[in-house]
Design a protein with these regions (language model features):
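Non-catalytic helical/linker scaffolds that mediate oligomerization, partner binding
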Residues: 1-474
Length: 474
């Protein structure tokens, strides 16, 4: 059975939002669709959600929708004529909180505290770090700078202040509006941007609970402060994203690979799914094939233990969105087929019953050469627990809950499947065998593992394990 354990997250944008393109992305291997709330209107996102849901039903493939909030991103303002301007090394350049149309000498920002937050000698980076400024002085609403590294500056580009701990809210008013919208439209995950401390995650969770939902929160790690508070954030979040774009601007590029491995290792320790993101196949925005370095980057993220890898501009605005997904799927499959062994999760000091059952069934799957592991779950807890121990065989997650099946689309090694509510533990083997034979996922004589919890339907009660031979007594 051809199977890919690691999942693919695709950002939906102008290049990929049509029904035809959504269908092609699903066929190529998309598991999770990311909606970037830094761009587009609520009308755009509502249309994309409807298109995604319709395509998922048509192809009978559960797909998770990840709503990615903009966060307290500081950006430059508009430019005269909406045209890029060229900044040259050595010239003076002003960033002002006044409302002005920018040009080659100045640009506005809506971040009003900026003049209070920076001082002489501080570095300011624009446009994902491509342009570097040094603060000369602050005069009223103006921050007067010298251009150290020049370049072309477009409208609404990011402003980064390395080494400066900004006093900004974890969620802006726009984020709160977008969060309510995303929850109303059934987003399966919420990504909180620029998380710096666990309180940022807890705030997002509080707002989710107030809306009467239990939607998981993914913490995007893109600030050095987040790395300082990594374990506390992992304890609060439901998953994390290694957002290497802003992370690579806020810290020296040579540190990013080490930090990436640290985040993934700690996330595995805390049993949190981790998405590795940003510029993975960046050249495929313009070219039909990636560079060899990009292919290695994707493979190494898999070797590190990522649950999922993400495409951003490659699928949102690139020329080859379908080819990028197909290429990423092939790289993952090749990496997973190699002799390189995925790192096992670092065990906690004391295993609980659920963890012990999950670890044992994964160990048995190797010893008994199982075809797959069948998991019966309402909330997805059992499937996530088994996934933590990285079995070599697929995890078929049977659930009567549509929201659970969609969320499982992000989790490593899990193939979500619908099944009616099962009340009795005795019939699990017969139910699993019938369904698996119908889908031709097993053959007579195959050994499978069955994991569930009793009483059935109660979260966190993973305490049942059975080995079953297809065609044998149930």
């Amino acid at each position: 059975m051809a199977f890919r354990h690691s999942k693919i997250v695709c950002t939906i944008g102008p290049a990929s939002c049509s029904p035809r393109m959504i269908r092609r992305l699903l066929e190529a291997g998309m598991d999770v669709a990311r909606l970037n709330f830094s761009h587009g209107t609520h009308t755009d996102h509502a249309q994309n959600i409807a298109t995604l849901r319709a395509a998922a039903v048509e192809q009978e493939k559960p797909i998770a929708i990840l709503a990615d909030l903009q966060g307290p991103k500081i950006r430059t303002g508009p430019l005269a004529g909406s045209r890029s301007v060229l900044l040259r090394a050595g010239q003076r350049f002003v960033i002002t909180t006044a409302k002005v149309l920018g040009d080659s000498t100045r640009v506005s920002t809506v971040f009003r505290p900026l003049p209070r937050e920076v001082h002489r000698g501080d570095r300011i980076l624009l446009s994902d770090g491509l342009i570097e400024l040094r603060v000369l002085k602050v005069r009223g609403p103006e921050v007067i700078c010298e251009v150290i590294n020049g370049g072309a500056l477009g409208e609404h580009k990011g402003i980064n202040l390395p080494g400066i701990k900004l006093k900004v809210p974890a969620l802006t008013s726009k984020d709160r509006e977008d969060l309510v919208f995303a929850l109303k439209h059934g987003a399966d995950y919420i990504a909180a941007s620029f998380v710096r401390r666990p309180e940022d995650v807890l705030l997002a969770k509080t707002l989710v609970q107030r809306a009467g939902k239990n939607t998981p929160i993914i913490a995007k790690l893109e600030k050095p402060e987040a790395i300082e508070n990594l374990d506390a954030i992992l304890g609060a979040a439901d998953g994390v994203m290694v957002a290497r774009g802003d992370l690579g601007v806020e810290m020296n590029p040579e540190r990013v690979p080490v930090v990436q491995k640290t985040i993934i290792t700690r996330a595995r320790h805390f049993r949190r799914p981790v998405i590795t993101a940003t510029q993975m196949l960046e050249s495929m925005t313009e070219n039909p094939r990636p560079t060899r370095a990009e292919a290695s980057d994707v493979a190494n993220a898999i070797f590190d233990g990522s649950d999922a890898v993400m495409l951003s501009a490659e699928t949102a605005s690139g020329k080859y969105p379908v080819e990028a997904v197909s290429m990423m799927a092939r790289i993952i499959e090749e990496a997973e087929a190699s002799d390189w062994e995925s790192p096992r999760r670092v065990p906690l000091e004391k295993l609980k019953v659920a963890e012990t059952v999950a670890e044992l069934v994964c160990h048995a799957s190797r010893e008994l050469h199982m075809r797959l592991i069948a998991v019966f779950t309402h909330s997805g807890f059992t499937a996530r627990m088994v996934s933590c121990y990285r079995p070599a065989v697929p995890i078929i997650a049977f659930s009567p809950e549509s929201a659970t099946r969609r969320r499982m689309a992000l989790i490593w090694g899990v193939m979500p499947r619908h099944i009616p509510n099962v009340q009795k533990i005795d019939g699990l083997a017969a139910i699993a065998e019938k369904r698996l034979l119908e889908e031709r996922l097993v053959r007579k004589g195959d050994v499978i593992g069955i994991v569930a919890g009793t009483p059935m339907g109660i979260r966190g009660t993973t305490n049942f394990m059975k080995f079953h031979v297809i065609g044998g007594p149930a």
